[in-house]
Amino acid sequence: MPNSLAGGQVPNPTLDAFDLVDRSLRNAGISGSIPGLEEGGTDPWTFSPLKNADQLKEVGMASRLRRVVSSFLKACGLLGSLYFFICSLDILSSAFQLLGSKMAGDIFKDNVVLSNPVAGLVIGVLVTVLVQSSSTSSSIVVSMVASKLLTVQVSVPIIMGVNVGTSITSTLVSMAQSGDRDEFQRAFSGSAVHGIFNWLTVLVLLPLESATAALERLSELALGAASLQPGQQAPDILKALTRPFTHLIIQLDSSVITSGITSNTTNSSLIKHWCGFRGETPQGSSEGCGLFSSCTERNSSASPEEDRLLCHHLFAGSKLTDLAVGFILLAGSLLVLCVCLVLIVKLLNSVLKGRIAQAVKTVINADFPFPFGWLSGYLAILVGAGLTFLLQSSSVFTAAIVPLMGVGVIDLERAYPLFLGSNIGTTTTALLAALASPADMLIFAVQVALIHFFFNLAGILLWYLVPVLRLPIPLAKRFGNLTAQYRWVAIVYLLLTFLLLPLAAFGLSLAGGTVLAAVGGPLVGLVLLIILVNVLQQHRPSWLPRCLQSWAWLPLWLHSLEPWDRLVTACCPCRACSNSPMTSKVAHCYENPQVIASQQL
Protein backbone atom coordinates (compact mmCIF):
# COMPACT_ATOMS: atom_id res chain seq x y z
CA MET A 1 0.00 0.00 0.00
CA PRO A 2 1.46 3.39 -0.92
CA ASN A 3 1.72 5.90 1.86
CA SER A 4 -0.29 9.11 1.58
CA LEU A 5 -0.16 12.52 3.23
CA ALA A 6 -2.92 14.63 4.67
CA GLY A 7 -5.31 16.02 2.08
CA GLY A 8 -4.77 13.14 -0.30
CA GLN A 9 -1.38 14.44 -1.40
CA VAL A 10 1.14 11.99 -2.74
CA PRO A 11 4.74 12.41 -1.58
CA ASN A 12 7.44 13.21 -4.08
CA PRO A 13 9.48 10.29 -5.44
CA THR A 14 12.52 9.49 -3.34
CA LEU A 15 16.09 9.39 -4.61
CA ASP A 16 15.94 5.61 -4.40
CA ALA A 17 13.02 5.60 -6.82
CA PHE A 18 14.90 7.78 -9.29
CA ASP A 19 17.90 5.50 -8.93
CA LEU A 20 15.79 2.45 -9.71
CA VAL A 21 14.22 4.20 -12.70
CA ASP A 22 17.67 5.15 -13.99
CA ARG A 23 18.92 1.60 -13.60
CA SER A 24 15.83 0.20 -15.30
CA LEU A 25 16.35 2.57 -18.24
CA ARG A 26 19.91 1.37 -18.57
CA ASN A 27 18.79 -2.26 -18.42
CA ALA A 28 16.24 -1.53 -21.14
CA GLY A 29 19.10 -0.45 -23.39
CA ILE A 30 18.38 3.29 -23.45
CA SER A 31 21.79 4.36 -22.19
CA GLY A 32 23.80 1.15 -22.49
CA SER A 33 23.41 -1.97 -20.42
CA ILE A 34 25.75 -3.47 -17.93
CA PRO A 35 25.69 -7.25 -17.41
CA GLY A 36 25.82 -6.86 -13.67
CA LEU A 37 22.73 -4.66 -13.74
CA GLU A 38 20.85 -6.91 -16.09
CA GLU A 39 21.21 -9.80 -13.73
CA GLY A 40 21.01 -8.44 -10.24
CA GLY A 41 19.55 -4.96 -10.51
CA THR A 42 22.43 -3.31 -8.68
CA ASP A 43 25.57 -1.69 -9.98
CA PRO A 44 28.56 -3.52 -8.43
CA TRP A 45 30.89 -0.66 -9.40
CA THR A 46 28.85 1.82 -7.33
CA PHE A 47 28.74 0.55 -3.78
CA SER A 48 25.30 0.66 -2.19
CA PRO A 49 24.69 3.01 0.75
CA LEU A 50 25.71 1.45 4.01
CA LYS A 51 23.25 0.78 6.76
CA ASN A 52 23.26 3.19 9.62
CA ALA A 53 25.14 1.91 12.59
CA ASP A 54 22.56 3.38 14.99
CA GLN A 55 20.67 0.10 14.84
CA LEU A 56 23.58 -1.47 16.74
CA LYS A 57 23.02 0.62 19.84
CA GLU A 58 23.24 -1.53 22.92
CA VAL A 59 21.84 -1.06 26.37
CA GLY A 60 23.49 -2.37 29.47
CA MET A 61 27.07 -3.11 30.40
CA ALA A 62 26.78 -6.82 29.57
CA SER A 63 25.74 -6.11 25.98
CA ARG A 64 28.54 -3.60 25.49
CA LEU A 65 31.09 -6.01 26.94
CA ARG A 66 29.82 -8.77 24.68
CA ARG A 67 30.20 -6.53 21.64
CA VAL A 68 33.75 -5.52 22.66
CA VAL A 69 34.78 -9.16 23.14
CA SER A 70 33.18 -10.09 19.82
CA SER A 71 35.03 -7.30 18.01
CA PHE A 72 38.33 -8.32 19.61
CA LEU A 73 37.86 -11.96 18.60
CA LYS A 74 36.96 -10.93 15.05
CA ALA A 75 40.08 -8.77 14.83
CA CYS A 76 42.24 -11.64 16.10
CA GLY A 77 40.58 -14.02 13.65
CA LEU A 78 41.18 -11.58 10.80
CA LEU A 79 44.87 -11.16 11.65
CA GLY A 80 45.30 -14.91 12.09
CA SER A 81 43.59 -15.66 8.78
CA LEU A 82 45.75 -13.06 7.05
CA TYR A 83 48.91 -14.56 8.58
CA PHE A 84 48.11 -18.10 7.43
CA PHE A 85 46.99 -16.72 4.06
CA ILE A 86 50.46 -15.20 3.56
CA CYS A 87 52.12 -18.39 4.78
CA SER A 88 50.04 -20.46 2.35
CA LEU A 89 51.22 -18.22 -0.50
CA ASP A 90 54.83 -18.85 0.53
CA ILE A 91 54.28 -22.62 0.69
CA LEU A 92 52.39 -22.50 -2.62
CA SER A 93 55.44 -20.84 -4.17
CA SER A 94 57.66 -23.59 -2.73
CA ALA A 95 55.31 -26.24 -4.15
CA PHE A 96 55.49 -24.74 -7.63
CA GLN A 97 59.28 -24.55 -7.39
CA LEU A 98 59.43 -28.25 -6.50
CA LEU A 99 57.10 -29.13 -9.38
CA GLY A 100 58.52 -26.86 -12.05
CA SER A 101 62.10 -25.98 -11.19
CA LYS A 102 63.68 -28.77 -13.24
CA MET A 103 61.46 -27.94 -16.20
CA ALA A 104 62.33 -24.26 -15.81
CA GLY A 105 66.02 -25.12 -15.82
CA ASP A 106 65.64 -27.21 -18.98
CA ILE A 107 63.79 -24.36 -20.70
CA PHE A 108 66.48 -21.82 -19.83
CA LYS A 109 69.25 -24.07 -21.15
CA ASP A 110 68.12 -23.73 -24.77
CA ASN A 111 70.08 -20.62 -25.74
CA VAL A 112 69.05 -20.82 -29.42
CA VAL A 113 65.39 -20.45 -28.50
CA LEU A 114 66.11 -17.66 -26.02
CA SER A 115 67.66 -15.54 -28.76
CA ASN A 116 64.15 -15.03 -30.19
CA PRO A 117 62.52 -12.06 -28.34
CA VAL A 118 59.02 -13.58 -28.47
CA ALA A 119 60.31 -16.93 -27.23
CA GLY A 120 62.23 -15.17 -24.44
CA LEU A 121 59.09 -13.32 -23.39
CA VAL A 122 57.02 -16.51 -23.32
CA ILE A 123 59.71 -18.38 -21.40
CA GLY A 124 59.79 -15.61 -18.79
CA VAL A 125 56.01 -15.90 -18.38
CA LEU A 126 55.95 -19.70 -18.20
CA VAL A 127 58.90 -20.01 -15.82
CA THR A 128 57.44 -17.43 -13.43
CA VAL A 129 54.09 -19.24 -13.55
CA LEU A 130 55.88 -22.52 -12.82
CA VAL A 131 57.99 -21.33 -9.89
CA GLN A 132 55.52 -18.65 -8.67
CA SER A 133 58.38 -16.33 -7.77
CA SER A 134 59.70 -13.40 -9.77
CA SER A 135 62.78 -13.31 -7.52
CA THR A 136 63.67 -16.90 -8.45
CA SER A 137 63.13 -16.21 -12.15
CA SER A 138 65.25 -13.05 -11.96
CA SER A 139 68.02 -14.90 -10.12
CA ILE A 140 68.12 -17.50 -12.89
CA VAL A 141 68.48 -14.76 -15.51
CA VAL A 142 71.23 -13.01 -13.54
CA SER A 143 73.15 -16.25 -13.06
CA MET A 144 73.00 -17.03 -16.76
CA VAL A 145 74.12 -13.52 -17.73
CA ALA A 146 76.98 -13.64 -15.21
CA SER A 147 78.01 -17.07 -16.54
CA LYS A 148 78.06 -15.71 -20.13
CA LEU A 149 75.26 -18.08 -21.12
CA LEU A 150 73.04 -15.12 -21.99
CA THR A 151 73.68 -11.57 -23.08
CA VAL A 152 71.90 -8.65 -21.45
CA GLN A 153 70.09 -7.97 -24.73
CA VAL A 154 68.61 -11.49 -24.76
CA SER A 155 67.61 -11.23 -21.09
CA VAL A 156 65.40 -8.14 -21.56
CA PRO A 157 62.38 -9.99 -23.07
CA ILE A 158 62.70 -12.63 -20.35
CA ILE A 159 62.49 -9.93 -17.67
CA MET A 160 59.35 -8.60 -19.38
CA GLY A 161 57.85 -12.08 -19.22
CA VAL A 162 58.77 -12.37 -15.55
CA ASN A 163 56.86 -9.16 -14.89
CA VAL A 164 53.78 -10.53 -16.68
CA GLY A 165 53.90 -13.89 -14.91
CA THR A 166 53.66 -12.37 -11.44
CA SER A 167 50.05 -11.27 -12.03
CA ILE A 168 48.78 -14.86 -12.03
CA THR A 169 48.82 -15.01 -8.22
CA SER A 170 46.18 -12.31 -7.79
CA THR A 171 44.07 -13.96 -10.51
CA LEU A 172 44.14 -17.28 -8.66
CA VAL A 173 43.20 -15.52 -5.42
CA SER A 174 40.20 -13.84 -7.05
CA MET A 175 38.80 -17.25 -8.04
CA ALA A 176 38.14 -17.97 -4.36
CA GLN A 177 35.42 -15.27 -4.38
CA SER A 178 33.47 -16.78 -7.27
CA GLY A 179 30.64 -17.80 -4.94
CA ASP A 180 29.22 -14.26 -4.84
CA ARG A 181 28.64 -12.69 -8.25
CA ASP A 182 29.23 -9.03 -7.32
CA GLU A 183 32.27 -9.80 -5.14
CA PHE A 184 33.74 -11.95 -7.89
CA GLN A 185 33.10 -9.23 -10.46
CA ARG A 186 35.04 -6.64 -8.45
CA ALA A 187 37.80 -9.04 -7.34
CA PHE A 188 38.40 -10.45 -10.81
CA SER A 189 38.46 -7.01 -12.40
CA GLY A 190 41.12 -6.03 -9.85
CA SER A 191 43.31 -8.99 -10.74
CA ALA A 192 42.68 -8.47 -14.46
CA VAL A 193 43.71 -4.80 -14.39
CA HIS A 194 47.18 -5.87 -13.22
CA GLY A 195 47.61 -8.43 -15.98
CA ILE A 196 46.18 -6.13 -18.67
CA PHE A 197 48.60 -3.38 -17.68
CA ASN A 198 51.56 -5.76 -17.92
CA TRP A 199 50.49 -7.15 -21.30
CA LEU A 200 49.78 -3.72 -22.80
CA THR A 201 53.20 -2.53 -21.65
CA VAL A 202 54.83 -5.57 -23.25
CA LEU A 203 52.97 -5.03 -26.54
CA VAL A 204 54.44 -1.53 -26.77
CA LEU A 205 57.93 -2.00 -25.31
CA LEU A 206 58.89 -5.40 -26.77
CA PRO A 207 58.92 -4.21 -30.41
CA LEU A 208 60.55 -0.96 -29.32
CA GLU A 209 63.25 -2.82 -27.40
CA SER A 210 63.86 -5.23 -30.30
CA ALA A 211 64.34 -2.30 -32.67
CA THR A 212 66.27 0.17 -30.50
CA ALA A 213 67.48 -1.65 -27.33
CA ALA A 214 66.18 1.34 -25.38
CA LEU A 215 65.93 -0.35 -21.96
CA GLU A 216 69.37 -1.94 -22.29
CA ARG A 217 71.00 1.37 -23.22
CA LEU A 218 69.14 3.24 -20.49
CA SER A 219 70.32 0.73 -17.88
CA GLU A 220 73.91 1.06 -19.16
CA LEU A 221 73.70 4.85 -18.82
CA ALA A 222 72.40 4.50 -15.27
CA LEU A 223 75.21 2.09 -14.42
CA GLY A 224 77.79 4.45 -15.90
CA ALA A 225 76.48 7.37 -13.85
CA ALA A 226 76.48 5.40 -10.59
CA SER A 227 79.39 4.26 -8.49
CA LEU A 228 78.43 0.78 -7.39
CA GLN A 229 79.38 -0.41 -3.93
CA PRO A 230 78.22 -3.68 -2.42
CA GLY A 231 75.43 -2.88 0.01
CA GLN A 232 73.31 -4.56 2.60
CA GLN A 233 70.37 -6.79 1.89
CA ALA A 234 66.92 -5.23 1.64
CA PRO A 235 64.75 -5.40 4.78
CA ASP A 236 62.99 -8.72 5.17
CA ILE A 237 60.09 -7.88 7.48
CA LEU A 238 57.48 -10.24 6.07
CA LYS A 239 59.81 -13.24 5.85
CA ALA A 240 60.87 -12.65 9.44
CA LEU A 241 57.23 -13.08 10.49
CA THR A 242 56.33 -16.05 8.30
CA ARG A 243 59.63 -17.97 8.30
CA PRO A 244 59.18 -19.53 11.78
CA PHE A 245 56.03 -21.28 10.54
CA THR A 246 56.87 -22.00 6.90
CA HIS A 247 60.31 -23.39 7.76
CA LEU A 248 58.57 -25.99 9.92
CA ILE A 249 56.76 -27.19 6.79
CA ILE A 250 59.45 -27.02 4.08
CA GLN A 251 62.88 -25.52 3.43
CA LEU A 252 64.31 -25.21 -0.08
CA ASP A 253 67.76 -24.60 -1.48
CA SER A 254 66.96 -22.25 -4.36
CA SER A 255 70.59 -22.20 -5.51
CA VAL A 256 70.04 -25.72 -6.89
CA ILE A 257 67.99 -24.21 -9.73
CA THR A 258 70.66 -21.77 -10.87
CA SER A 259 73.54 -24.19 -10.34
CA GLY A 260 71.67 -26.81 -12.35
CA ILE A 261 71.66 -24.41 -15.30
CA THR A 262 75.18 -23.05 -15.05
CA SER A 263 76.98 -26.28 -14.09
CA ASN A 264 74.70 -28.87 -15.76
CA THR A 265 73.99 -30.72 -12.50
CA THR A 266 70.45 -32.03 -12.45
CA ASN A 267 70.49 -34.74 -9.77
CA SER A 268 70.41 -32.48 -6.70
CA SER A 269 67.27 -32.27 -4.62
CA LEU A 270 65.70 -28.87 -4.12
CA ILE A 271 64.61 -29.88 -0.61
CA LYS A 272 67.17 -28.86 1.98
CA HIS A 273 67.89 -31.79 4.29
CA TRP A 274 71.08 -30.60 6.02
CA CYS A 275 71.38 -27.21 7.73
CA GLY A 276 74.95 -27.17 9.01
CA PHE A 277 77.52 -29.17 10.95
CA ARG A 278 77.88 -30.18 14.54
CA GLY A 279 79.64 -27.56 16.61
CA GLU A 280 78.70 -24.79 14.15
CA THR A 281 75.77 -22.41 13.94
CA PRO A 282 73.07 -23.85 11.70
CA GLN A 283 72.91 -21.94 8.46
CA GLY A 284 69.17 -21.99 8.03
CA SER A 285 69.06 -18.26 8.56
CA SER A 286 69.26 -15.97 5.58
CA GLU A 287 71.15 -13.20 7.34
CA GLY A 288 74.04 -11.88 5.32
CA CYS A 289 72.98 -13.67 2.15
CA GLY A 290 72.22 -11.88 -1.07
CA LEU A 291 69.32 -12.63 -3.38
CA PHE A 292 71.53 -14.38 -5.89
CA SER A 293 73.92 -16.11 -3.48
CA SER A 294 73.52 -19.29 -1.50
CA CYS A 295 73.87 -19.27 2.27
CA THR A 296 73.12 -22.96 2.79
CA GLU A 297 75.26 -26.05 2.61
CA ARG A 298 74.50 -28.21 -0.40
CA ASN A 299 73.07 -31.70 0.09
CA SER A 300 76.03 -33.11 -1.79
CA SER A 301 78.54 -32.02 0.86
CA ALA A 302 81.56 -34.25 1.16
CA SER A 303 81.53 -34.11 4.97
CA PRO A 304 80.80 -37.31 6.86
CA GLU A 305 77.09 -37.81 7.30
CA GLU A 306 77.38 -38.09 11.07
CA ASP A 307 78.82 -34.55 11.25
CA ARG A 308 75.86 -32.93 9.50
CA LEU A 309 72.80 -31.52 11.25
CA LEU A 310 69.39 -32.50 9.96
CA CYS A 311 67.07 -29.59 9.23
CA HIS A 312 63.94 -29.21 11.33
CA HIS A 313 61.03 -29.29 8.91
CA LEU A 314 58.31 -31.73 7.94
CA PHE A 315 60.11 -33.31 4.98
CA ALA A 316 63.68 -33.31 6.32
CA GLY A 317 65.18 -36.74 5.76
CA SER A 318 62.14 -37.87 3.77
CA LYS A 319 62.62 -40.37 0.95
CA LEU A 320 59.89 -38.73 -1.13
CA THR A 321 60.89 -37.18 -4.44
CA ASP A 322 60.65 -33.45 -5.10
CA LEU A 323 57.66 -34.08 -7.36
CA ALA A 324 55.73 -35.98 -4.67
CA VAL A 325 56.46 -33.37 -2.01
CA GLY A 326 55.46 -30.65 -4.47
CA PHE A 327 52.04 -32.21 -5.08
CA ILE A 328 51.47 -32.65 -1.35
CA LEU A 329 52.36 -29.03 -0.62
CA LEU A 330 50.31 -27.82 -3.60
CA ALA A 331 47.14 -29.53 -2.39
CA GLY A 332 47.64 -28.48 1.22
CA SER A 333 48.54 -24.86 0.46
CA LEU A 334 45.59 -24.43 -1.93
CA LEU A 335 43.23 -25.80 0.71
CA VAL A 336 44.58 -23.47 3.39
CA LEU A 337 44.57 -20.57 0.92
CA CYS A 338 40.89 -21.04 0.06
CA VAL A 339 39.85 -21.49 3.70
CA CYS A 340 41.75 -18.37 4.76
CA LEU A 341 40.26 -16.34 1.91
CA VAL A 342 36.74 -17.38 2.86
CA LEU A 343 37.40 -16.47 6.50
CA ILE A 344 38.94 -13.12 5.53
CA VAL A 345 35.97 -12.20 3.34
CA LYS A 346 33.43 -13.27 5.98
CA LEU A 347 35.22 -11.40 8.76
CA LEU A 348 35.66 -8.28 6.63
CA ASN A 349 31.96 -8.29 5.82
CA SER A 350 31.22 -8.66 9.52
CA VAL A 351 33.66 -6.04 10.79
CA LEU A 352 33.46 -3.46 8.01
CA LYS A 353 29.85 -2.35 8.25
CA GLY A 354 27.98 0.77 9.19
CA ARG A 355 29.99 3.86 9.98
CA ILE A 356 33.25 1.90 10.26
CA ALA A 357 33.00 0.72 6.66
CA GLN A 358 31.98 4.17 5.50
CA ALA A 359 35.01 5.71 7.19
CA VAL A 360 37.42 3.10 5.78
CA LYS A 361 36.08 3.42 2.24
CA THR A 362 36.11 7.20 2.43
CA VAL A 363 39.72 7.34 3.61
CA ILE A 364 41.08 4.79 1.13
CA ASN A 365 39.20 6.06 -1.92
CA ALA A 366 39.31 9.78 -1.09
CA ASP A 367 40.90 12.36 -3.39
CA PHE A 368 42.69 15.57 -2.52
CA PRO A 369 40.61 18.77 -2.76
CA PHE A 370 40.47 20.61 -6.07
CA PRO A 371 42.78 21.40 -7.84
CA PHE A 372 45.07 18.75 -6.37
CA GLY A 373 42.82 15.73 -6.91
CA TRP A 374 45.17 14.38 -9.59
CA LEU A 375 47.85 13.87 -6.93
CA SER A 376 45.81 11.18 -5.14
CA GLY A 377 46.67 8.49 -7.68
CA TYR A 378 50.39 9.25 -7.53
CA LEU A 379 50.25 9.08 -3.74
CA ALA A 380 48.63 5.65 -4.10
CA ILE A 381 51.53 4.61 -6.35
CA LEU A 382 53.99 5.65 -3.64
CA VAL A 383 51.96 3.80 -1.00
CA GLY A 384 51.89 0.64 -3.11
CA ALA A 385 55.63 0.86 -3.75
CA GLY A 386 56.40 1.46 -0.07
CA LEU A 387 54.22 -1.38 1.22
CA THR A 388 55.63 -3.80 -1.37
CA PHE A 389 59.14 -2.75 -0.41
CA LEU A 390 58.37 -3.47 3.26
CA LEU A 391 56.62 -6.77 2.53
CA GLN A 392 59.32 -7.80 0.01
CA SER A 393 56.66 -9.49 -2.11
CA SER A 394 54.47 -8.00 -4.81
CA SER A 395 52.46 -11.24 -4.98
CA VAL A 396 51.46 -10.98 -1.32
CA PHE A 397 50.54 -7.30 -1.66
CA THR A 398 48.39 -7.75 -4.77
CA ALA A 399 46.82 -10.91 -3.35
CA ALA A 400 45.82 -8.95 -0.24
CA ILE A 401 44.30 -6.11 -2.29
CA VAL A 402 42.03 -8.40 -4.34
CA PRO A 403 39.79 -9.61 -1.43
CA LEU A 404 39.45 -6.01 -0.23
CA MET A 405 38.21 -5.09 -3.69
CA GLY A 406 35.77 -7.97 -3.63
CA VAL A 407 34.09 -6.82 -0.41
CA GLY A 408 33.98 -3.24 -1.68
CA VAL A 409 36.57 -1.56 0.53
CA ILE A 410 38.82 -0.47 -2.38
CA ASP A 411 37.46 0.55 -5.77
CA LEU A 412 39.10 -0.24 -9.09
CA GLU A 413 40.26 3.33 -9.74
CA ARG A 414 42.20 3.32 -6.46
CA ALA A 415 43.49 -0.26 -6.77
CA TYR A 416 44.99 0.44 -10.20
CA PRO A 417 47.69 2.88 -8.96
CA LEU A 418 48.31 0.60 -5.96
CA PHE A 419 49.14 -2.24 -8.37
CA LEU A 420 51.40 0.06 -10.39
CA GLY A 421 53.20 1.05 -7.20
CA SER A 422 53.59 -2.62 -6.34
CA ASN A 423 55.38 -3.16 -9.66
CA ILE A 424 57.79 -0.36 -8.78
CA GLY A 425 58.23 -1.58 -5.21
CA THR A 426 59.26 -5.08 -6.22
CA THR A 427 61.93 -3.68 -8.56
CA THR A 428 63.43 -1.45 -5.86
CA THR A 429 63.56 -4.44 -3.55
CA ALA A 430 65.34 -6.43 -6.26
CA LEU A 431 67.73 -3.52 -6.82
CA LEU A 432 68.78 -3.44 -3.16
CA ALA A 433 69.05 -7.21 -3.11
CA ALA A 434 71.23 -7.05 -6.23
CA LEU A 435 73.63 -4.73 -4.41
CA ALA A 436 74.12 -7.49 -1.83
CA SER A 437 75.02 -10.09 -4.46
CA PRO A 438 78.59 -11.40 -4.97
CA ALA A 439 81.13 -9.15 -6.69
CA ASP A 440 81.25 -11.26 -9.86
CA MET A 441 77.48 -10.88 -10.29
CA LEU A 442 77.08 -7.32 -9.02
CA ILE A 443 77.06 -5.50 -12.38
CA PHE A 444 74.75 -8.00 -14.07
CA ALA A 445 72.36 -8.18 -11.11
CA VAL A 446 72.06 -4.41 -10.91
CA GLN A 447 71.58 -4.04 -14.67
CA VAL A 448 68.80 -6.66 -14.73
CA ALA A 449 67.11 -4.94 -11.77
CA LEU A 450 67.39 -1.57 -13.54
CA ILE A 451 65.86 -2.99 -16.73
CA HIS A 452 62.96 -4.31 -14.66
CA PHE A 453 62.57 -0.91 -12.98
CA PHE A 454 62.63 1.09 -16.23
CA PHE A 455 60.15 -1.33 -17.81
CA ASN A 456 57.57 -0.69 -15.08
CA LEU A 457 58.31 3.03 -15.02
CA ALA A 458 57.71 3.21 -18.78
CA GLY A 459 54.43 1.35 -18.28
CA ILE A 460 53.27 4.01 -15.80
CA LEU A 461 54.21 6.77 -18.23
CA LEU A 462 52.27 5.01 -20.99
CA TRP A 463 49.11 3.88 -19.20
CA TYR A 464 48.69 6.22 -16.22
CA LEU A 465 50.29 9.62 -16.79
CA VAL A 466 47.59 10.69 -19.31
CA PRO A 467 44.10 9.95 -17.86
CA VAL A 468 42.56 9.18 -21.25
CA LEU A 469 45.18 6.44 -21.80
CA ARG A 470 44.31 4.53 -18.62
CA LEU A 471 42.94 1.76 -20.81
CA PRO A 472 43.45 -1.10 -18.32
CA ILE A 473 40.61 0.25 -16.14
CA PRO A 474 37.76 0.08 -18.71
CA LEU A 475 39.14 -3.17 -20.12
CA ALA A 476 39.23 -4.71 -16.64
CA LYS A 477 35.65 -3.57 -16.02
CA ARG A 478 34.56 -5.29 -19.22
CA PHE A 479 36.24 -8.49 -18.07
CA GLY A 480 34.55 -8.10 -14.69
CA ASN A 481 31.14 -7.65 -16.33
CA LEU A 482 31.70 -10.74 -18.46
CA THR A 483 32.75 -12.87 -15.50
CA ALA A 484 29.71 -11.69 -13.53
CA GLN A 485 27.44 -12.96 -16.31
CA TYR A 486 29.53 -15.98 -17.36
CA ARG A 487 31.81 -17.10 -14.55
CA TRP A 488 33.60 -19.67 -16.68
CA VAL A 489 35.14 -16.75 -18.63
CA ALA A 490 37.55 -16.30 -15.70
CA ILE A 491 38.95 -19.81 -16.21
CA VAL A 492 39.21 -19.24 -19.96
CA TYR A 493 41.04 -15.95 -19.33
CA LEU A 494 43.45 -17.69 -16.95
CA LEU A 495 44.22 -20.52 -19.37
CA LEU A 496 44.53 -18.31 -22.45
CA THR A 497 46.59 -15.54 -20.86
CA PHE A 498 49.10 -17.59 -18.92
CA LEU A 499 49.22 -20.93 -20.74
CA LEU A 500 47.63 -21.48 -24.16
CA LEU A 501 48.51 -18.22 -25.92
CA PRO A 502 52.10 -18.18 -24.57
CA LEU A 503 52.54 -21.82 -25.62
CA ALA A 504 51.15 -21.07 -29.09
CA ALA A 505 53.50 -18.10 -29.50
CA PHE A 506 56.37 -20.25 -28.22
CA GLY A 507 55.60 -23.00 -30.72
CA LEU A 508 55.47 -20.53 -33.61
CA SER A 509 58.75 -18.95 -32.51
CA LEU A 510 60.43 -22.37 -32.58
CA ALA A 511 59.55 -22.62 -36.26
CA GLY A 512 61.46 -19.42 -36.96
CA GLY A 513 60.83 -15.72 -37.25
CA THR A 514 59.35 -16.04 -40.76
CA VAL A 515 56.68 -18.51 -39.66
CA LEU A 516 55.94 -16.44 -36.56
CA ALA A 517 55.43 -13.31 -38.65
CA ALA A 518 53.42 -15.12 -41.35
CA VAL A 519 50.99 -16.72 -38.87
CA GLY A 520 51.04 -14.38 -35.91
CA GLY A 521 50.98 -11.13 -37.89
CA PRO A 522 47.59 -11.71 -39.60
CA LEU A 523 46.07 -13.06 -36.37
CA VAL A 524 47.16 -10.00 -34.39
CA GLY A 525 45.94 -7.73 -37.19
CA LEU A 526 42.55 -9.48 -37.21
CA VAL A 527 42.18 -9.09 -33.44
CA LEU A 528 43.07 -5.39 -33.62
CA LEU A 529 40.58 -4.90 -36.49
CA ILE A 530 37.79 -6.58 -34.50
CA ILE A 531 38.55 -4.39 -31.49
CA LEU A 532 38.49 -1.26 -33.67
CA VAL A 533 35.16 -2.23 -35.26
CA ASN A 534 33.62 -2.92 -31.84
CA VAL A 535 34.72 0.49 -30.56
CA LEU A 536 33.30 2.22 -33.64
CA GLN A 537 30.05 0.26 -33.34
CA GLN A 538 29.54 1.70 -29.87
CA HIS A 539 30.71 5.28 -30.42
CA ARG A 540 30.71 6.08 -34.16
CA PRO A 541 28.54 3.52 -36.00
CA SER A 542 27.93 5.96 -38.86
CA TRP A 543 31.61 5.71 -39.79
CA LEU A 544 31.23 2.02 -40.63
CA PRO A 545 29.63 0.37 -43.66
CA ARG A 546 26.11 -0.91 -43.02
CA CYS A 547 27.27 -4.52 -42.92
CA LEU A 548 29.76 -3.77 -40.12
CA GLN A 549 27.45 -1.68 -37.94
CA SER A 550 26.30 -4.91 -36.31
CA TRP A 551 27.54 -8.49 -36.03
CA ALA A 552 24.01 -9.89 -36.38
CA TRP A 553 24.81 -11.33 -39.83
CA LEU A 554 27.34 -13.70 -38.26
CA PRO A 555 26.34 -17.00 -36.62
CA LEU A 556 25.32 -16.48 -33.01
CA TRP A 557 28.26 -18.44 -31.61
CA LEU A 558 30.69 -16.04 -33.31
CA HIS A 559 29.39 -12.85 -31.66
CA SER A 560 27.69 -14.00 -28.47
CA LEU A 561 28.68 -16.09 -25.47
CA GLU A 562 25.16 -17.43 -24.94
CA PRO A 563 25.66 -20.64 -26.99
CA TRP A 564 28.98 -21.25 -25.26
CA ASP A 565 27.33 -20.60 -21.90
CA ARG A 566 24.67 -23.21 -22.60
CA LEU A 567 27.38 -25.69 -23.56
CA VAL A 568 29.43 -25.00 -20.43
CA THR A 569 26.33 -25.12 -18.22
CA ALA A 570 25.35 -28.47 -19.71
CA CYS A 571 28.83 -29.87 -19.10
CA CYS A 572 29.25 -28.26 -15.66
CA PRO A 573 25.83 -27.74 -14.01
CA CYS A 574 27.29 -26.23 -10.84
CA ARG A 575 26.45 -22.90 -9.25
CA ALA A 576 29.88 -21.46 -9.99
CA CYS A 577 29.42 -21.98 -13.75
CA SER A 578 25.83 -20.79 -14.18
CA ASN A 579 23.51 -18.07 -12.99
CA SER A 580 21.03 -18.89 -10.27
CA PRO A 581 17.31 -18.86 -11.18
CA MET A 582 16.61 -16.31 -8.45
CA THR A 583 19.04 -13.88 -10.05
CA SER A 584 17.33 -14.11 -13.41
CA LYS A 585 13.93 -13.65 -11.79
CA VAL A 586 14.97 -10.51 -9.95
CA ALA A 587 16.23 -8.98 -13.17
CA HIS A 588 12.68 -8.81 -14.54
CA CYS A 589 11.63 -6.51 -11.69
CA TYR A 590 13.42 -3.59 -13.29
CA GLU A 591 11.94 -3.81 -16.76
CA ASN A 592 9.13 -1.25 -16.20
CA PRO A 593 10.30 2.09 -14.75
CA GLN A 594 6.74 3.32 -14.12
CA VAL A 595 5.94 0.31 -11.96
CA ILE A 596 9.08 0.87 -9.90
CA ALA A 597 8.29 4.55 -9.40
CA SER A 598 4.72 3.80 -8.36
CA GLN A 599 5.89 1.20 -5.85
CA GLN A 600 8.16 3.75 -4.21
CA LEU A 601 5.44 6.46 -3.95
Swiss-Prot record:
Its main location: membrane. Disulfide bonds join C275-C311. InterPro entries: Na/Pi_transpt (IPR003841). Optimum pH is 7.5. Residues 97-110, 209-324, 391-441, 509-512 are extracellular. GO terms for biological process: intracellular phosphate ion homeostasis; phosphate ion transport; sodium-dependent phosphate transport. Expressed only in the kidney. It catalyses: 2 Na(+)(out) + phosphate(out) = 2 Na(+)(in) + phosphate(in). The chain crosses the membrane at residues 76-96, 111-131, 188-208, 325-345, 370-390, 442-462, 488-508, 513-533. PANTHER family: SODIUM-DEPENDENT PHOSPHATE TRANSPORT PROTEIN 2C (PTHR10010:SF35), SOLUTE CARRIER FAMILY 34 SODIUM PHOSPHATE , MEMBER 2-RELATED (PTHR10010). Involved in actively transporting phosphate into cells via Na(+) cotransport in the renal brush border membrane. The cotransport has a Na(+):Pi stoichiometry of 2:1 and is electroneutral. This is Sodium-dependent phosphate transport protein 2C.
